[in-house]
Design a protein with these regions (language model features):
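Non-catalytic regulatory/interaction regions at protein termini and inter-domain linkers
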Residues: 1-147
Length: 147
């Protein structure tokens, strides 16, 4: 008999109105999972500054703050050299950018991965109703909802 690799890819989508709103949605998810998952962040906009401001306003302990600040919020990551298993990959940008990063991930073909695609509702090309159909769950400030 053949042993097949089990692929567990969970795809979440997230819709936000501003960088702070995006970070407010991501923060609880990251806080909950930062000790058991590795995170990679791909973003067209550098989020380092706004994330630092936000984290300084939270009541997280300094270890958690530092762990979160040490994530690469400027979005400059190289996918090719990474073993993506057990990663959560956060992708923030326009449709083309999100598709491009997802294509690169699919080529690497990891066994177990979470992908969170983040869409700005201010982008006129974003159609939340149509986009949501492609995802397992939607992430919002109260956690994630089953679709």
């Amino acid at each position: 008999f053949m042993i097949t690799k089990e692929h567990k890819i969970k795809k979440y989508c997230l819709f936000y109105a501003s960088d702070f709103h995006l970070e407010m949605i991501l923060l609880p998810y990251i806080k909950k999972n930062i000790y058991k998952e590795k995170f990679l962040i791909f973003t067209q906009e550098n989020l380092s500054e706004s994330m630092e401001i936000l984290l300084n306003r939270t009541n997280l302990d300094s270890d958690e703050k530092n762990m979160m600040l040490n994530l690469n919020w400027d979005g400059k990551e190289n996918l090719e050299e990474k073993d993506l298993n057990n990663y959560t990959i956060i992708i923030n940008g326009n449709n083309e950018y999100i598709s491009e990063i997802n294509d690169k991930i699919n080529k690497i073909n990891p066994d177990k991965i979470n992908i969170i695609d983040c869409y700005s509702i201010n982008d006129k090309n974003i159609e939340p109703q149509r986009i949501k159909e492609k995802y397992d769950d939607i992430l919002n400030t109260s956690g994630y909802k089953k679709m």
